[in-house]
Every structure is written in C-alpha cells, then in structure tokens.
Amino acid sequence: MKLLEERILKDGDVLGENILKVDSFLTHQVDFELMQEIGKVFADKYKEAGITKVVTIEASGIAPAVYAAQALGVPMIFAKKAKNITMTEGILTAEVYSFTKQVTSQVSIVSRFLSNDDTVLIIDDFLANGQAAKGLLEIIGQAGAKVAGIGIVIEKSFQDGRDLLEKTGVPVTSLARIKAFENGRVVFAEADA
C-alpha cells in the first residue's frame, strides 16, 4: 500500500536493527484517515470470504481492525491482555509473546462473541515473530470458528513471523513489508495489497 509506505518513510523512526517506531500515526497517536484507508484495503481483499467478525489484540491493532470491520459491516472483537472482573463467563485464552514489549501476556476473548458459525479476519498492527496472530488463531480455534485471513499493517519480513503463519495455511496479507533496515532507513519488499 503506497500510502502507508510513504507515511512510514515520512514519519517512521528506525530504532536499532529491528524496531520501527510509528507512534505518530499507528501505535500511540492514530491517523484515522490512514486507518480508514487501511480498513478499506483489507475489506476489499476479503469481501468475498464471508467474514462475520474481525478480531485483533489490544491495543494498536484496534484502530485498523475497527475500520476493516466497519468497511465489512461486521463486529470487531479485541482480545484483552488482562482479565477483568466483568469477564465472568466462558473465556477463550492463549499466551502471546510480544516482541516489542518483551513480555508474555495471557490474552482472552469472552466465548459468547465467537462461535463455530463465524468466519474471522484477524487484523494486527505488526508482524514480527507471529506470536500475536498465532495466539489469536488458537483462541479462534477454541471457538470452532474459521479464519479466512490475517491482515497485517506492517510486516517485518526479515523476521520469522510470516513463515510461522504461512505454515498454518491461513492467507497472510501485509500492506507494508519491510525487507530490511539499512543505515537507519526502511527498505521495502513488495506488499501483498
């Protein structure tokens, strides 16, 4: 997605050898116009897949997931990283390791929001080691729902996440694919959409 790649080049900051900081438009402050365009691209890609729910993990995946769900006309569910006292009924859970935060979280979705009648589109902000999407695949599997695809806003193709996810047989669509960071600059690979 050219618009996204241009924004990454303009406002993204490369930190070290494998971190891209995009807090000015995705991971802290949200550019809703860009997120709306991202949502439309994902919706167009999966419009024939019979999507009934869009699923993400809090927090930075919420904005693109909301706009994808809106464009598809379906609900969006976000897996919570901390169980709260209102989550008293059946809970679907998985452990997820965050590459950026370097912590493992137990993420949860209330079971009544997903069923074996659902066809899900997973959306996430980044794909690095694939653990977030893998955890969501596990939760969705616990519900007996089907996953039509995984939509990634920014993929770090030099890490092993895509390989991990492709082994599941679920299609992966990344709007910006980063081949490398060279001398503090982003080098893109060809995107999926």
UniProtKB/Swiss-Prot annotation:
SUPFAM superfamilies: PRTase-like. It comes from the Bacteria. It is found in: Cytoplasm. Pathway: Purine metabolism; XMP biosynthesis via salvage pathway; XMP from xanthine: step 1/1. Xanthine binds at L20, T27, K156. One of its GO terms (molecular function) is xanthine phosphoribosyltransferase activity. Its main location: cytoplasm. It catalyses: XMP + diphosphate = xanthine + 5-phospho-alpha-D-ribose 1-diphosphate. Gene3D superfamilies: 3.40.50.2020. Transmembrane segments: none annotated. 5-phospho-alpha-D-ribose 1-diphosphate binds at A128, N129, G130, Q131, A132. Its EC number is 2.4.2.22. GO terms for cellular component: cytoplasm. GO terms for biological process: purine ribonucleoside salvage; xanthine metabolic process; XMP salvage. Keywords: Cytoplasm, Glycosyltransferase, Purine salvage, Transferase. Homodimer. Converts the preformed base xanthine, a product of nucleic acid breakdown, to xanthosine 5'-monophosphate (XMP), so it can be reused for RNA or DNA synthesis. Belongs to the purine/pyrimidine phosphoribosyltransferase family. Xpt subfamily. This is Xanthine phosphoribosyltransferase. The gene is xpt.
